[in-house]
């Protein structure tokens, strides 16, 4: 049955990519959790979607130009709702340790945010952190940048990956460069992808928030969906599991 991935945690009800959002994702029973990783000025892995802190904190500036200490001084919760004042941008290590502490045993999708900025050492640092211990959850890496995924597979040939795309052009480009494992298409390309995916590879579709789109993915028995509302998706999925 279709797996439910909490997109940036429970992004629809909690400030995205924060520990509060990931706690909620685990609490509601998400099958998977998706997050985004950038590198700070001092080479630390931080979990945030945008290249800048402007949208989701009370600060300004590009991640690559800020130190971890500067980023940790920011409020990453108040923009969403004042209840979450004081939430911080977490490091990737903090999220991994939290998920382990909470007993999460699903899949963690780490999106490598190299489609706009090429972070030197990002892949190596993620794999090194992953290798520090045995985690109770599976890890899959995804990226819109196929070159990043090629680099990752050279460093760890057995690591599971997924190719993100939102255009036919990049789907074909990435597919030609990579071993065929899984596709992560934009919802708007679902019909095209279903025809194009002649090898019947697993599809993890983003971002699926409307009931009608969730129901269609369940009916098609899509491998997984990324949603901002995992609790709602899990409730809808129950109708297909009876």
Annotate each predicted stretch with a short phrase.
Residues 1-242:
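Phosphate-group recognition and catalysis centered on beta-loop-alpha active-site segments
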């Amino acid at each position: 049955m279709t797996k439910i991935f909490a997109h940036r945690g429970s992004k629809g009800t909690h400030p995205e990519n924060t520990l509060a959002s990931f706690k909620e994702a685990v609490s509601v029973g998400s099958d998977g959790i998706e997050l985004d990783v950038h590198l700070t000025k001092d080479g630390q892995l931080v979990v945030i979607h945008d290249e800048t802190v402007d949208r989701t904190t009370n600060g300004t500036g590009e991640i690559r130009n800020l130190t971890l200490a500067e980023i940790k001084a920011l409020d990453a919760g108040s923009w969403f709702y004042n209840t979450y004042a004081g939430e911080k941008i977490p490091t990737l290590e903090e999220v991994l340790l939290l998920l382990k502490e909470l007993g999460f045993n699903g899949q963690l999708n780490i999106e490598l945010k190299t489609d706009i900025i090429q972070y030197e050492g990002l892949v190596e640092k993620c794999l090194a952190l992953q290798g520090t211990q045995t985690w109770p959850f599976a890890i899959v890496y995804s990226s819109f940048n196929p070159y990043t995924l090629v680099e990752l597979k050279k460093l760890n040939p057995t690591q599971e990956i997924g190719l993100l795309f939102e255009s036919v052009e990049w789907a074909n480009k990435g597919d030609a460069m990579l071993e065929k494992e899984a596709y992560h298409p934009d919802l708007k390309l679902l019909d095209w992808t279903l025809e194009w995916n002649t090898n019947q590879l697993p599809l993890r579709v983003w971002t699926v928030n409307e009931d009608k789109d969730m129901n269609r993915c369940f009916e098609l028995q899509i491998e997984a969906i990324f949603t901002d509302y995992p609790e709602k998706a899990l409730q809808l999925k129950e109708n297909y599991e009876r």
